[in-house]
UniProtKB/Swiss-Prot annotation:
Primary site of residence: virion
Organism superkingdom: Viruses
UniProt keywords, alphabetically: Capsid protein, Helical capsid protein, Host cytoplasm, Ribonucleoprotein, RNA-binding, Superantigen, Viral nucleoprotein, Virion
InterPro entries: Rhabdo_ncap_2
Region (Disordered): 401-447
Function field: Encapsidates the genome, protecting it from nucleases. If expressed without protein P it binds non-specifically RNA and therefore can bind it's own mRNA. Interaction with protein P abolishes any non-specific RNA binding, and prevents phosphorylation. The soluble N-P complex encapsidates specifically the genomic RNA, with protein N protecting the genome like a pearl necklace. The encapsidated genomic RNA is termed the nucleocapsid (NC) and serves as template for viral transcription and replication. Protein N binds protein P in the NC through a different interaction, and can be phosphorylated.
Protein family membership: Belongs to the nucleorhabdovirus nucleocapsid protein family.
Entry's localization field: Virion; Host cytoplasm
Lineage: Viruses, Riboviria, Orthornavirae, Negarnaviricota, Haploviricotina
This protein's name: Nucleoprotein
Pfam families (alphabetical): Rhabdo_ncap_2
UniProt subunit comment: Homomultimerizes to form the nucleocapsid. Binds to viral genomic RNA.
Natural source organism: Maize mosaic virus (isolate Maize/United States/Reed/2005)
C-alpha cells in the first residue's frame, strides 16, 4: 500500500455528482453535536458563580464542628449542611506564623452578588462507593497530654483543605496522600498534631464528600472563590503561597485544560523556545480551536496583573475552555503527553505517567505509532533549534553528540586555537557563522 502512487491532481478532484458540495464541517449545523464552549469573561464567570461566605471561627468552634462533621461521615448522615461546614473549616486555615488566616477577607463589591445566603439542605448525600473498610491508617503516634487548641485548629483546617481536593480528585488520592499530608503539616507549621495523626477515612466516607461537591454548585463555587483569592493575593515567595500550593493550587488549577497544562510543563523544560514556535511544531489539522484558545490565554489572561479566576473557572462552569480538553484534542494530547513523559520530570503514583489517560490508552496502535514518529521529529527539531539559535544554551558536548554544528571561537595567534595552522575546528553540521576551513558535512539530525 505504501508504494501506491497517488497523482497530485486526484487529491482535489471531485466526483461529478458531488462537485457542488464544497461545504466543510463548520458550515453544516448537524455536524456540531458537541457541547458548545462558553467564552470566558470575568462577567460571565460571576454570572455562573454562587458561593458560601466564610467567616472567622474560634478554636473551640472549629473543634466541635469537626467532631460533628466526622460523626456525620461515620453515621452516613453527611449532608450539604456538613459540606458547607467542611468549606468553612478549610478556609479558616491559619498562617504558619502569627494569628492571621490565609483565605478569609472582606469580600469586594464585584463578588458580593455571588454570595449564596440560603441555608443548605440536610438531606444525606449518598455514597458512590460501598467500601467501608478503613483505607487510611493512623500514623501510630500517640498524644502526650491534651492537644493545644490552636494546633488542633490548624490541623483540622489543613486536613479539610486537603479533603477539598476531592473537587477534582478521586477518594484514592486522599488515601494515598494521607502520610504526605501529615508530614507536610509538620514541616510547614513546625509541630505535630495528634488529631491529624490519628484520623482515618474509608472510600464510602470520601465518596460522600466528592458526590456533595459535584452535586452542589455553591460548594464548588466556594472552593473556587477562596482558592482564586489566595492565588491572587499571596506572593510566590511567601509561606502562605507555599501552603496553598501544596494543599490546593497544584491540584485545582487548569483542571480540564489538559492541552495548556502540558504545554506549560514542556515550555518549562524547553525554556529557550518561544511558545508560538513550539505551537507551530506540534499543531495538527484538528488543533486549530485549541491553538486559538491558547493564543487568547497567553495574550489576555495568563498575565501577572490579571485576576487568577480563569485558572479555576471550570469549577464554576465546565463549558469554559472546552477546546483545551483532552477529548477534543486526542492527537495533540497524545503528542504533548509523550513529550512530557520524555522531557519533563514526573512525580510518582498518579503523577508518574502523563500518557496514562483514557483518550490515549484507547487510541488505535497505528495512531500511537504515528504519534511516536511526530514526537521524535519534534525532539529533533528542538535539538536543531537549540544549537542553531546561538548563545550558550547548547553546550559543546550536547551539540557534538547530536551531530549539529556550533561555530568555533576565532583562532588565536601562535596556534592557540587547538589546531595546527590556526584553522578552526569543524563541528559536524556547522552553520558556518564565523567559521573557516572545509565545507560543513551533512548533519545527521538535519531535517
Amino acid at each position: 500500500m505504501a508504494n501506491i502512487n497517488i497523482p497530485d491532481d486526484l487529491v482535489s478532484k471531485y466526483s461529478e455528482d458531488v462537485k457542488d458540495l464544497t461545504q466543510k464541517a463548520g458550515s453544516i449545523p448537524s455536524s456540531k453535536s458537541l457541547i458548545p464552549q462558553t467564552a470566558f469573561t470575568p462577567d460571565e464567570l460571576r454570572r455562573s458563580l454562587k458561593f458560601w461566605q466564610v467567616t472567622t471561627k474560634v478554636a473551640a468552634t472549629v473543634a466541635s464542628d469537626w467532631t460533628n462533621l466526622a460523626t456525620a461521615l461515620t453515621n452516613g448522615t453527611f449532608s450539604a449542611t456538613h459540606l458547607r461546614t467542611l468549606c468553612e473549616l478549610a478556609f479558616n486555615l491559619k498562617a504558619p506564623t502569627g494569628t492571621g488566616t490565609i483565605f478569609i477577607h472582606e469580600i469586594a463589591d464585584p463578588w458580593k452578588g455571588c454570595i449564596d445566603a440560603n441555608a443548605p439542605d440536610t438531606v444525606a448525600i449518598p455514597a458512590t462507593d460501598s467500601d467501608v473498610n478503613m483505607s487510611t491508617v493512623s500514623s501510630g503516634s500517640t498524644a502526650s497530654g491534651t492537644e493545644d487548641a490552636e494546633v488542633k485548629m490548624k490541623a483540622i483546617s489543613f486536613l479539610c483543605c486537603t479533603l477539598l481536593r476531592l473537587s477534582v480528585k478521586e477518594p484514592s488520592h486522599i488515601m494515598q496522600a494521607i502520610n504526605s499530608i501529615r508530614q507536610r503539616f509538620g514541616s510547614l507549621y513546625g509541630v505535630s498534631s495528634p488529631t491529624l495523626n490519628s484520623v482515618t477515612f474509608n472510600r464510602s466516607q470520601l465518596s460522600r464528600i466528592k458526590q456533595g461537591i459535584e452535586t452542589y454548585p455553591s460548594a464548588r463555587g466556594t472552593v473556587f472563590y477562596y482558592t482564586r483569592y489566595a492565588d491572587a493575593t499571596h506572593g510566590y515567595t511567601t509561606k502562605e503561597y507555599g501552603i496553598c500550593r501544596f494543599l490546593l493550587f497544584q491540584h485545582l488549577e487548569l483542571e480540564g485544560m489538559h492541552i495548556y497544562k502540558m504545554l506549560l510543563a514542556l515550555l518549562g523544560e524547553w525554556s529557550t523556545v518561544p511558545i508560538g514556535l513550539l505551537l507551530t511544531w506540534i499543531r495538527n489539522p484538528r488543533s486549530k480551536l485549541a491553538i486559538n484558545e491558547i493564543v487568547k490565554i497567553v495574550k489576555e489572561l495568563d498575565k501577572p496583573e490579571v485576576d487568577k479566576g480563569w485558572k479555576y473557572a471550570r469549577m464554576v462552569n465546565n463549558t469554559f475552555f472546552l477546546d483545551l480538553s483532552s477529548r477534543r484534542n486526542t492527537y495533540l494530547c497524545a503528542v504533548l503527553a509523550s513529550l512530557n513523559k520524555k522531557n519533563v520530570p514526573q512525580g510518582s503514583g498518579e503523577y508518574a505517567d502523563p500518557t496514562n489517560i483514557a483518550v490515549i490508552k484507547n487510541m488505535d496502535q497505528s495512531v500511537k505509532s504515528q504519534v511516536a514518529t511526530d514526537v521524535t521529529l519534534i525532539e529533533r527539531i528542538y535539538e536543531k533549534y537549540l544549537v542553531s539559535a546561538g548563545g550558550d544554551e547548547a553546550g559543546t558536548a550536547y551539540a557534538l553528540s547530536r551531530g549539529v554544528k556550533r561555530s568555533s571561537p576565532p583562532s588565536q595567534e601562535g596556534g592557540q586555537s587547538g589546531q595546527s595552522g590556526g584553522t578552526p575546528m569543524e563541528v559536524d553540521g556547522a552553520s558556518g557563522r564565523g567559521a573557516a576551513g572545509p565545507a560543513p558535512k551533512k548533519t545527521r539530525s538535519g531535517l
